[in-house]
Amino acid sequence: MSEPVTTPIFDGLAVGLCTYKRRDSLVRCLDHIAIAARALPAPPSVIVVDNDGEDASVGAAVQAFSERSGLPVHYRIEKTPGISAARNAVFDTAGQIGVRFVAMIDDDEWPSPDWLRELLKAQSDHAAVVVGAPVRPVFPDNAAKLKKYARYWSVDKQFLNGKPFVFCTCNFLIDMQALRDEPRPLFDEEFGLSGGGDTVFFRKLFFRGHDMAWSDAAWINEEVPPSRASFKWMRQRRFRVGNHAVRWESLDGGAPKSIAKSVGLSLRLAIYPLFRREPESVLVGWLLEYDKVRGRWASHFGDVFVEYARPAKPGEKVCR
């Protein structure tokens, strides 16, 4: 493992995002970042890490964005497959250009006009190292019925040990000063293809005492493509949540503690509908909880859900 970065951190903000074969949605995201940047006293830098690099039109689109927006853009190709390598490349670049804060967003999302200003405001108000914010799903027209269940596709405020806990990189701001003594790479390569490495990263920061905060005003939108606009996909996602949870729980407290939790959650399934935690539909809530528990047991028996596997054929999508 490499030594901690000791380069001084200076003032400034960079917006980072990783992309993989999503040129059109990447351009949409970048254009909305430019709108959000107008609310700031100084322009942010933009860091785009392409985890593919085979399509020259992506780099050309990023360059065109920089020219029309006037924002400084750092475009980097990361050939190592997996989301961990791409995220690490974002933070390596941020360290090289010397910014104080990094905000991250996914390439299939687009921010609200006040996104960056509200993230920075929450950081200042709470003196937080990490600030998270909501992600709101945007369904295709033929899946309007799913709006009733939108929260299953959303990212909302979470707590850990009674404190705000940011658990994913799809919408957050971080103070780079808190990372000066963190060993590199920040995101564990063991989670590069499976996903879940962002939760591992944030749990490390949380248990080392770094304060986290939440800003409801810094919301962003996420496109839900037809391939994700179904309960079949959501059940798979809940399986993945349970599967990955066992992996990071085992890192924290060891396998026996994680197995004990799985036993407890399995027994709770018999009375889970009584809790009515999902008022939209008791049955849907139970099925999703069942899939989460099923994913946990699969992990205990060595089955790792791989979210970022590369396509076997050109044009094929794998869990995206």
Question: Where is each model-derived feature located?
Answer:
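N-proximal low-complexity "stem/linker" segments adjacent to membrane-targeting elements
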Residues: M1-I35, P41
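Acidic donor-binding segment of Leloir-type glycosyltransferases
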Residues: H32-R76
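Active-site nucleotide-sugar/metal-binding loop of Leloir-type enzymes
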Residues: A85-F101
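Short beta-strand-to-loop acidic/aromatic patch adjacent to the donor-nucleotide binding site
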Residues: G98-W110
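Conserved donor NDP-sugar-binding/catalytic core segment of glycosyltransferases
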Residues: D114-K145
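Short, flexible, basic/aromatic active-site loop/helix in glycosyltransferases
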Residues: A133-P134, K147-F165
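Acidic donor-binding loop at a coil-to-helix junction in glycosyltransferase catalytic cores
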Residues: G192-R203
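Non-catalytic, C-terminal membrane-associated alpha-helical segments of glycosyltransferases
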Residues: Q236-V241, G253-R320
